[in-house]
């Protein structure tokens, strides 16, 4: 029974569909901060990871932000999302662009989520596979929830 439920949840992900940047962010945010509705104020990894996307200082630096501070991630969701976008445009421009245009693939979301979790080469690291499975499950859940919504 559990196998059938898992297959039912993941089935929509196997069909050719376009994905959006918002869908990717929503799934990543949920994996990063779980049941916390907005992720604002969430501090993780002994104070090193801040806000809805659990952004570390080196990630913030790599995003090459020209305003704000790393601490701004803690209380500003839009700022945090801008950091993620800049980081992904730097390390995975094609995938990010397709997602921003609403024509992303599941592979695009896999790549950016694994980079988010494991750094610029995160998509090649075995250690980021479990993270990707969590993002993929959340993506499936979100898609199924939107289909069932009135």
For each predicted feature, which ranges?
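Sec-dependent N-terminal signal peptides
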Residues: 3-12
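Catalytic glycan-binding domains that act on GlcNAc-containing polysaccharides
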Residues: 16-150
